[in-house]
């Protein structure tokens, strides 16, 4: 079963028809759109600022999404694939990437 944890009173929100691998970790202020896949070993850590993921996004094995301490939001648009072991740290990615 995936690690989905509330942090600082905020629980992740996961859209419809999403696949979340059993050892993926989704923590804190994370919103995932519809029809997404979060693969094995991926970590989405919305501990100090939010992470917003659009629809039809593929976060592949071992990827890490994390925010910076100074007012950064990680935003991933619609129809995006973050490749194996990708690191998205305090950055935004537009649609169709």
Name each region found by the language model.
Residues 1-17:
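Terminal amphipathic alpha-helical/low-complexity segments used for targeting or macromolecular assembly
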Residues 9, 47-48, 54, 70-71:
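Residues at secondary-structure transition points
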Residues 12, 17-20, 24, 30, ...:
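A structural motif detector for beta-strand N-caps
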